[in-house]
Swiss-Prot record:
Signal peptide: none annotated. Involved in oxidative stress response and redox homeostasis. Required for hydrogen peroxide-induced oxidation and nuclear localization (activation) of CAP1. Functions probably in concert with GPX3, the actual CAP1 modifying enzyme. This is CAP1-binding-protein. Disruption phenotype: Leads to decreased virulence in a Galleria mellonella model. Keywords: Cytoplasm, Stress response, Virulence. Interacts with CAP1. Its main location: cytoplasm. It comes from Candida albicans (strain SC5314 / ATCC MYA-2876) (Yeast). GO terms for biological process: cellular response to oxidative stress; positive regulation of transcription by RNA polymerase II; symbiont-mediated perturbation of host defenses. The keyword Cytoplasm applies. GO terms for molecular function: DNA-binding transcription factor binding. InterPro entries: YAP-bd/ALF4/Glomulin (IPR013877), YBP1/2 (IPR040347). The lineage of its organism: Eukaryota, Fungi, Dikarya, Ascomycota, Saccharomycotina.
Amino acid sequence: MENLESGAQDALQSKDFLSYSTLLDIYLNDPTKYSNEEKEQLLGHILTILSENKQLTYEIGWDLPQLLILYVDSDYEFNGPIRDSPGVYKILKIFENLAINGNHKELFLKSCELLNDLELSQDEDIELLKRENFFEIKLYCVFELIDACLKKIHTLYPSRFLAMTVSSFNNLMFKLTKQHGSLGNYHFVMKRVYSFCRNYISPPLPTNAKEMPQEELDKIVKDEEYLQRRLLTGFLTQVIYLANINGTEGYSIEHFSWLQQQSKSKIKFVFERDGAFCDRFVELASSFDIDLLKCFQGFITDSHKLLIGIDYKNKNKSEDEIIELLFERVVVDYQKNVLTSIVDSDAKAIKDSIIGELILFTHSIAGKKNFAKPTMSIHDSLVMTLRLIIPQMVNPKFINAGNHDVVVFWVWFALYQQQIINSKNLQLEISYIPKVLLTTFFQCLLFIVIKSEGKPNFKYMLLTLLTKLLTLSPDTGYEFIKDSLNNCPYESVYPSLIGVYKQLLLNEKWDVNSIELEKLNISSSSSNTPPKLPPRNGIKRKHFSLTNESLNDLVDLINNSSKNAFVEDNSKIDPSKLSTIAAYLNLLVAIKKDPVIVENKEKLTTLISSIENKIKSVKKSSQNQFELNAAGMLEITIERFNE
């Protein structure tokens, strides 16, 4: 301690501040060599030295943040206030001293570098909550120092410094998305952004600015005001986009929960968002004159334009060639126009994040439960889905769970608005959509289902939505299911698809426009017209009808599933294929009284006998309890079919 104090006096007398910075580096670069008590003493001593020597703080302060931040981590359990964490209170006071007495430009530059390098610790021996707490303390220290210094830098071109701040913070946010922090951690980070944007004040002009010609100065100030405003809106929307890469607030699942509560059907689950936090960002966007409705409508219009010019009925091109053209066009657009940086690749324009704007607008609409505006057709929701989801199907680096939630919400919104409020014939509307687009739309939704493992309620909601959409185009819907069960590379989705197919074969409908949403009790805020009653003498029909041809398809699918499930000369069962063959057999049990099944009993008897023989082979050869239990389960299902 004496060395630090005497070194400070020597530096002030000799003006050799670099040597003192080196001395501090020697003492501070390894926190592990000190006990908590020693850290407190060391940091307290440095605080005293800096508080008593403003010139020293100005000369050497720029080097301290990167050293001090190392002392935030400790064995503190966070059972009390943060200020009780070893050294943290003194670190906060040192940063406060730097913000007042340091060289603001040098501190700003060094702090931006530090912010850029800041990240959540990956030491799994430390509890995630503790790691996040220490990360938040570090972020608070560094970002508050940046903010304080930025307000005190005299410059004609403040946009340059603001751009550095924005860039460093965005890099931090991007790294955070890869580390999958908790919701609370994201909220803390977002609060820093909100506070910064809302309270931002342009730095002061240099003292010699008055010497410039007034016209020239006015032009610079006006240009800089514009650039700063564009940087702030870009920052706001980009951070919203980044914060939602791993999932949004749950707009679609909340809407589905609301639908269940309005319906006479059994409620599967209840979900309600707390939208207060994101409400602030919507208000902030409005204060920056971001017209979210205009942004949304522009995105939908551009999505339609993107698909214009593709000849979906071109007889000289195969369907695969048309799909290839569609995918190429959408992916190029996504990279060029949707997945944007604040400053574009040519450094010629500052851009807001389109995805961030879509999320903010979705948030502004989702909580209102008013489905009259904006106008949203099924075709609108389709082009939106294709534009945002196709790129994710092509390249995993584009995966964005927030986009999944947003597009699914707007599909539900369109269904409700067009059928319930506008009483549109949805099957007629969907019949005008080219088959290639409709099939790709279904594939996009199936892709979201595949990416929803570990989210049972979200997956259930998605499968319900997919089922409702498939009822609106039975022919295309059936081809989609058959093709998916034959060619989809994700085995895990097969049981769910088979379940959807079963519902479509079993569920009855009164007319082609019924997809159960008409059972809803519509509130007066949505419509004054009650839902139509089914016709008194309506003929009950299934959404999908089983035919001889579709039965042949089903038999082929079950045969293939059987071959994949029973391996090694039918002596073992592949665990990854068990759920699929079980789902197929349960489907047969459910539809066994269908006239087509009854008429083709012999064909099915041959199929079932083949599977029974494989089951017997497994029971005879295997000693594995899982396989024996699986064989027994399949055997029971077959018995139910044979009853």
